[in-house]
Amino acid sequence: MKAAVRYYTKTGNTKRLAEAVAKAVNAEALPISVPVKEPVDVLFLGNSYYAFTIDPEVRDFIRSLDKSKVGRIVNFGSAAMLNSTWKKVKAEAEKVGIAMDEREFHCKGEFKGMHKGRPNEEDLKAAAAFAKGIVG
């Protein structure tokens, strides 16, 4: 199964998760500014809530995806207060005809003194194990 990893981060938390996910699935963690050019079975997409929704750059990235090159999207991320962006990402993925995996990985992320040190080593190991479980 071929996988790609893209992420969007403002704090660096999601990048750390993306690197753990990428290592687990034998891919490279790249920012969403790098398009998905080769066909993949799974696109791991790392993101978080910003101002109570996904960042417009994440929305634009999803809208730019070629459904003939992406089998499905697997969501992952971290946040200090809110939880999953899954529903928001799914809504955008549906607009471009890309399936959204029901499974996702989410953990707490450090922000303005909250959840100091997160994601931590345990979170990174859990993200890697999650990704391995997706690709088999």
Language-model regions, residue ranges each:
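FMN-binding flavodoxin-like domain, especially the glycine-rich phosphate-binding loop
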Residues: A3, T9-E28, P39-G136
